[in-house]
Regions:
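Helix-breaking motifs and short loop linkers at transmembrane-helix boundaries and internal kinks
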Residues: 45, 77, 98-103, 132, ...
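Extracytoplasmic gate region of multi-pass secondary transporters
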Residues: 33-34, 209-251, 255-261
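A late C-terminal transmembrane helix in Major Facilitator Superfamily
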Residues: 329-364, 371
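Conserved MFS/SLC helix-loop-helix module at the cytosolic interface between two early adjacent transmembrane helices
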Residues: 64-103
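Intracellular juxtamembrane helix-capping segments at the cytosolic ends
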Residues: 118-131, 313-327
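Helix-loop-helix hairpin linking two adjacent transmembrane segments in secondary transporters
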Residues: 133-134, 140-189
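Helix-to-loop junctions at the C-terminal end of transmembrane segments
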Residues: 65-77, 260-273
Length: 420
C-alpha cells in the first residue's frame, strides 16, 4: 500500500475500519470500573474519593493530552501518534492483570487516559480531511463505536469476574487494543500531509469567545458522562443491586449512547443548523437525570437509556459542530482539540463533585441535581450556535468565509453516500 492509499477508496475503507477499532477501545477502561467498585474496594480498601480518581484522572489527562496533540502533530505523523496511543491503551490495561494497590490501578488509568487523549486529538482532523463529505456520518460512527465499547466494558466485565479475578478481567481489555494496533501497522497508510504544520494564527483560537462556549458545552456533556460512569452502578449497588445487575444498567445507558451517537448526527446532517437536534439531546438528559433524582427505583432502565441517548447524541453533535466552524481541516482539528482539551479538564471535576456531594448528603441525588443545573446552562448556550454567524465569530477573512449553501450541500452529500 503506497502513501496515496489513504486518499483512495481502499485507503478510505482501511481508515474507516481503524476508526471503528479504535473507537471500541476508548471507553472500556472507564466503564468497567463502576460495576466492580465494591470488589475493588474490598481488596484494596479504596474509599470513594480514591475510586473517583479512576475516572477523574483519565478525563483530566485526556484534556491535557488533547491540548498537546496539535504541537505533537507538527513533529510527527498522525500514524505514529495513533500507534503510540494504542500502545499506551494496551499497556495501561495490561498493567491491571495483578493490581495489588490503588496506586497501580490509578497509574494504569493514567496511561489509558493519555492514549485516549492522543486518539481524540488526532482522529477528528483526519476524519474531516479524508471524509470531507461524510463528516457527520463518520464522526457518528466513531462516537457510536466509542460508546458501544463502553457498553461492552460495563456488561462483559462483571460477567468475566464470575470465572476470573476482577484484575484479570480488567486486563483482558488489552487484547482488542492489540487488534487495532495490528490493523494500523499492516493496513493503514496516511500521507505526511496529515501531520504538517498548522497554519499561522491558530494560536488565537483560544482567545475567541466561541471557543470557550464550545468548551463549556463539551465539559458539561462529559461531566455527565463521568458522573454516570463512576457512580451510576455504585448508586444502585448501595440499594441492594448486584454488580452484574448494576453493570447491565451502565450497559443499557451505553447502548442508548451508541444508537443516539450515530443516529442524531445523521438526522442533523441535512442542515448545518444542528440546534434543534442538540435541544432534543439535552431534553433527553433532563428527563433521564430528573428520573434518577426523583424516582430512581420506578424505571431505572428508562432513566439510564434517556441519559445515554442524550449524552451520546450531544457528544457526537458537539464534535460535528466544532468541525463545522472552520473549513480548513487542520484549523478545525485544532479547534476540536481545544474544545476537548479544556472541556475534558472541566468534565473531570464531575466525578469528584459527585463524591463530595455524596459525603455531604449521604446519597447520589445531589449529583444528579448538579448535572441538571449544568444542562440548563448548556441549553442557553446552544441557542448561540447559529451557523450563519460561524465566519464572524471565528474571525475568518472575507475571502475565506464559507457560504451556508456550500456547507449544506456538503452535509446533504453525507446523507446520500454510504461510508467508504
Amino acid at each position: 500500500m503506497n502513501q496515496r492509499n489513504a486518499d483512495q477508496p481502499a485507503g478510505h475503507t482501511a481508515l474507516l475500519v481503524l476508526v471503528i477499532l479504535i473507537g471500541l477501545n476508548l471507553r472500556p477502561f472507564l466503564t468497567a470500573i463502576g460495576p466492580l467498585a465494591q470488589a475493588i474496594d474490598q481488596r484494596l480498601a479504596l474509599g470513594m474519593d480514591t475510586l473517583a480518581w479512576l475516572t477523574l484522572l483519565p478525563l483530566w489527562l485526556i484534556g491535557i493530552g488533547v491540548l498537546l496533540t496539535p504541537s505533537l502533530r507538527r513533529r510527527t505523523s498522525a500514524r505514529q501518534l495513533l500507534g503510540l496511543a494504542l500502545l499506551l491503551l494496551g499497556i495501561g490495561s495490561a498493567m491491571r492483570f495483578d493490581a495489588q494497590s490503588g496506586a497501580l490501578l490509578i497509574a494504569s488509568a493514567a496511561l489509558c487516559g493519555l492514549g485516549s487523549a492522543l486518539v481524540q486529538g488526532v482522529l477528528p482532523a483526519l476524519i474531516k480531511q479524508h471524509f470531507a463529505r461524510k463528516v457527520p456520518l463518520v464522526m457518528g460512527i466513531f462516537s457510536a463505536c466509542m460508546m458501544g465499547g463502553g457498553a461492552l466494558g460495563a456488561s462483559l466485565t462483571p460477567r468475566l469476574v464470575a470465572s476470573l479475578d476482577w484484575s484479570r478481567a480488567l486486563a483482558l481489555w488489552s487484547l482488542p487494543v492489540l487488534l487495532a494496533l495490528v490493523w494500523l501497522v499492516w493496513q493503514v497508510r496516511l500521507p505526511r500531509a496529515a501531520a504538517v504544520a498548522i497554519l499561522h494564527g491558530e494560536q488565537r483560537l483560544i482567545t475567541l469567545p466561541r471557543s470557550w462556549l464550545l468548551i463549556v458545552c463539551f465539559g458539561i456533556i462529559n461531566s455527565g458522562y463521568g458522573i454516570v460512569v463512576a457512580w451510576l452502578a455504585p448508586a444502585y449497588m448501595a440499594n441492594g443491586w448486584s454488580a452484574a445487575q448494576a453493570g447491565e444498567l451502565v450497559a443499557w445507558l451505553a447502548l442508548a449512547q451508541t444508537a443516539s451517537g450515530l443516529g442524531l448526527p445523521l438526522l442533523a446532517a441535512r442542515s448545518l443548523d444542528r440546534r434543534r437536534w442538540m435541544g432534543l439531546a439535552i431534553a433527553m438528559q433532563l428527563a433521564g437525570f430528573g428520573g434518577l433524582w426523583l424516582a430512581p427505583a420506578s424505571a431505572p432502565i428508562l432513566w439510564c437509556m434517556l441519559c445515554g441517548a442524550g449524552l451520546g447524541g450531544s457528544f457526537s453533535l458537539i464534535m460535528v459542530i466544532a468541525l463545522d466552524h472552520l473549513p480548513d481541516p487542520r484549523r478545525a482539528g485544532t479547534l476540536s482539540a481545544l474544545m476537548q482539551g479544556f472541556g475534558f479538564m472541566l468534565a473531570a471535576t464531575g466525578p469528584w463533585v459527585a463524591a463530595w456531594l455524596y459525603h455531604l448528603f449521604g446519597d447520589f441525588a445531589a449529583a444528579w441535581q448538579w448535572q441538571l443545573g449544568g444542562l440548563l446552562l448548556m441549553s442557553l448556550l446552544v441557542l448561540r450556535l447559529d451557523p450563519r454567524h460561524y465566519p464572524r465569530v471565528m474571525g475568518l477573512p472575507t475571502a475565506s468565509k464559507p457560504t451556508l449553501s456550500a456547507h449544506l450541500s456538503t452535509s446533504a452529500a453525507a446523507q446520500s453516500n454510504t461510508p467508504a
